[in-house]
Amino acid sequence: MPRVESETYKRLQNDPSCIRNICIVAHVDHGKTSLSDSLLASNGIISQRLAGKIRFLDARPDEQLRGITMESSAISLYFRVLRKQEGSDEPLVSEHLVNLIDSPGHIDFSSEVSAASRLCDGAVVLVDVVEGVCSQTVTVLRQCWTEKLKPILVLNKIDRLITELQLTPQEAYIHLSKVIEQVNSVIGSFFANERQLDDLFWREQLEKNENAEYIEKDDSGIYFNPTDNNVIFASAIDGWGFNIGQLAKFYEQKLGAKRENLQKVLWGDFYMDPKTKKIINNKGLKGRSLKPLFTSLILENIWKIYQNIITSRDSEMVEKIAKTLNIKLLARDLRSKDDKQLLRTIMGQWLPVSTAVLLTVIEKLPSPLESQTDRLNTILVSESDTAAMDPRLLKAMKTCDKEGPVSAYVSKMLSIPREELPVESKRIASSDELMERSRKAREEALNAAKHAGMVENMAMMDLNDNSKNTSDLYKRAKDTVMTPEVGEQTKPKPSRNNDVFCVVSEPSSALDLEFEYEGEDDSDSQDNFGLDFVPTDIDPNDPLSSMFEYEEEDPLLESIKQISEDVNDEVDDIFDEKEECLVAFARIYSGTLRVGQEISVLGPKYDPKCPEEHIETAIITHLYLFMGKELVPLDVCPSGNIVGIRGLAGKVLKSGTLIEKGVQGVNLAGVNFHFTPIVRVAVEPANPVEMSKLVRGLKLLDQADPCVHTYVENTGEHILCTAGELHLERCLKDLTERFAGIEITHSEPAIPYRETFLSASDMNPPQNSQLGRGVHELLLSQYKITFRTFPLSGKVTDFLSQHQNSIKNILKTSTSSMDPVIESTGSSFLDKKSLLVAFEEVINQEEKSRELLSGFKVKLAGFGPSRVGCNILLSQDNLLGSLFEGTPAAFEYSDSIKNGFQLAVSEGPLANEPVQGMCVLVESVHKMSQDEIESIEDPRYQQHIVDLSGRLITSTRDAIHEAFLDWSPRIMWAIYSCDIQTSVDVLGKVYAVILQRHGKIISEEMKEGTPFFQIEAHVPVVEAFGLSEDIRKRTSGAAQPQLVFSGFECIDLDPFWVPTTEEELEELGDTADRENIARKHMNAIRRRKGLFIEEKVVENAEKQRTLKKN
């Protein structure tokens, strides 16, 4: 098929009923990009022979090298369907535009799936039939369920059942049935959870005496069933695929049955009676051993083709098969020794996978007209947003009205090298424009000279013996132009195109000055002016042009060098050798976007109740249609389409909402990214002078990757947070080669830890036996404050961790200082009443928690760290006030104690890491009498303190730390959940690698119908670097781990433990030969942070050196 003209795409964009926005999602290596290649080949974008090999949408070199997708790529496909009309020989032609997004499958890049899913209306879910449902398969199915995307299922790599597992057609049919059951069971679990939440919500409404009717949801249409034509059986690498409807049409004439009837019986327990030639079910078998129709009519024919081509080549049988299927084979095809190519030729003509997928997409997945009505409640963040938005905008979004107000959602910002953008036609400037440019160039030259203090001297200087009266020329030039103040000229001018970010790979020459003017048509055609050459835009007939001709030794050279050094940063910002442009990846929900249109940009924190905050204005400079790596320029783009937008750089960081100016908008940026940036490194330039380029590069990387988090530590270090080892490697490569363009050095990956304590049997005696364990009395000025600490149970800690977003929403806490690990976790929002009810239920599950946290609603004074963490601050007798009840604090310095609590849980006593699972109770605040003060013997006590409130903050922190250490302290390390699928041959090697890295096996089971074992293990993140490569080496590539961050886990060892009993001393000695893992990690963290470490520098001084005796 020849390539489709861009005008065809533009025409189809105007009809949302013929548009399908879909994304391809799956586990890593399940065949997404190979399937995309086949779909691209159907549009003539690539050759059919290269489909599955070229990986067209993997445009990055490292994607091609590793063979995995790292970034989402979009492309538009054209598909035409011919349907028969009753009473007419002319077929009914319907054209469709399919906007396809190929997303990554690796867990490190799952944020790309989240960004793609919000833009789409449907999803193509691929499952490798040999590996079955894997960890990422469940993740992408959950993403589809959350975003209300309608999915279709593609059972890919069926050829592996023939060539690798060597199953019979009947065994393959049973295996395929089980895979479909696995997928449906996952979807069923989502439905059951949602139904349970609906039931809980209904009961809460009844308790409020609201007449709420319970609506029972039907689950009949949510499952995959081949008879419903929402399942495709395929082998993308071999280029074939089909759904039941296609083969029902194929066998319609051969069997003399109606297509609708055949479609109902081609899948399932239906058989053909060989005597009566009738289709029967299980009841009609009567003990006979018959094969299902799917096996006898479909799978056996496919198996026969593979056996006669791949297993043992039989040319006569191949010709017979081609004739039966009405397939045209050339003589060169039959003579070819490439069996795979012959197989692709036959199967591609009989059952092309592109036709099967695109036909199913058109028939089963909704258009924007249909989906936006159903998904609008999911897209909108809350009901209050809906009530506050303009009714015209709401109606336009529901109907996908291209004439209504504009609304669009930007899911992420793409960074594209400027040279890869489409070249725009440049208009030839008129003579008047050339003269104006020449005048401006002279004006800039005079300003630069004036700044150098050389204007007066130049009138007296003869630059060239052969030139004419240069001093007169300079005087005339000075008189004919307006020279603004030098201070205004040295300020960097903002670019008209907000989307151009410059990256300097080498320092600019001191003479290569360049200026930009408002009168230019495009930023590419900037006028360059250098004092050592004639600018190209100066009219050669201008009598003043000779003043720009200089000899090789320029008398102004030294002065201009001084100017360049003074304004080096400004120069770097204005001119560079490499440029990156930010293009927004967006979906238009209503209205029509036009180039040059002024639009309102709403940030993710925008609230319709405060319409003046988190809102900016931008101008759309360019619109693009995505065609893989290529971009097609557009002038307008109506609703229902996926489009690229330039002009939003600096306005949209990672995601945002575009609303027509003057219209009350709504926040569409409520997408929940299921990722956690857990791996952190400190980056710095190899050359300290290039720090500004690193900062600029980090900002651009932060915008271009939705999973990256960058910030500056208190120490001044620039920190880069990524999702995993592979993601970190890609980010550092992009930062070096694209965004910063400089050589970068980075620290060893730093993993976040947590600190906690527990009650253990071998704890040391309490510090104060009279007060009890975990109690500390703070004596400060005239106050005696008693603090009590105790550990929270695991269920309470998990609840607080899962509902941090709800707590933050209720307390309206700013997220600017939140830990990125905290920000990315959390479930859906709960209101205040629901949160307290759910929290009380969790507390009542355990007797100890119920005893310690009784009456928490009145006592609760705060959470921490960042006021939303997994630690609780309580107070007796309203000393600190009540957080939820709103009662005032009885103690005048309550804020100081609250701030001290936040400091204490933000940096624990072990290694200055955040504390988790601690409850602090302020039992009493006693104002001491003079006699009590005089009886105090503590030498650290101070009675007269000038700034008591400030001193109380640090003293509270120290007191809580003292009470913390009275228990058995523990270091918590970050844990990966590791899923590995491997064969029995290398099972022992996988176990060895995991155990060697302090991991533990959680479960192991053999996947039914396959020779593979499914292993689930927990591996510490700090020990997981190089794990994937190590396992691949040990197993010769037979096993590939998938690592997902799953929280923090205690190292079950006291970091301060030393041998004390006779048995321990006898076994381990005074120096404890057994390594204390907890102490090792605690010391490593303290060493990295520059904290004191209690360790012996020299153990045995006499053994350091052996002197020879003469």
UniProtKB/Swiss-Prot annotation:
Keywords: Cytoplasm, GTP-binding, Hydrolase, Nucleotide-binding, Phosphoprotein, Ribosome biogenesis. InterPro entries: EFG_II, EFG_III/V, EFG_V-like, EFL1, EFTu-like_2, P-loop_NTPase, Ribosomal_Su5_D2-typ_SF, Ribsml_uS5_D2-typ_fold_subgr. GO terms for biological process: cytosolic ribosome assembly. The gene is RIA1. This is Ribosome assembly protein 1. It catalyses: GTP + H2O = GDP + phosphate + H(+). It is an enzyme of class 3 (hydrolase). Residues 17-262 form the tr-type G domain. The modification Phosphoserine is found at S431. It holds the Pfam family EFG_C. It comes from Saccharomyces cerevisiae (strain ATCC 204508 / S288c) (Baker's yeast). Belongs to the TRAFAC class translation factor GTPase superfamily. Classic translation factor GTPase family. GTPase activity is stimulated in the presence of 60S subunits. GTP binds at residues 26-33, 102-106, 156-159. GTPase involved in the biogenesis of the 60S ribosomal subunit and translational activation of ribosomes. Together with SDO1, may trigger the GTP-dependent release of TIF6 from 60S pre-ribosomes in the cytoplasm, thereby activating ribosomes for translation competence by allowing 80S ribosome assembly and facilitating TIF6 recycling to the nucleus, where it is required for 60S rRNA processing and nuclear export. Inhibits GTPase activity of ribosome-bound EF-2.
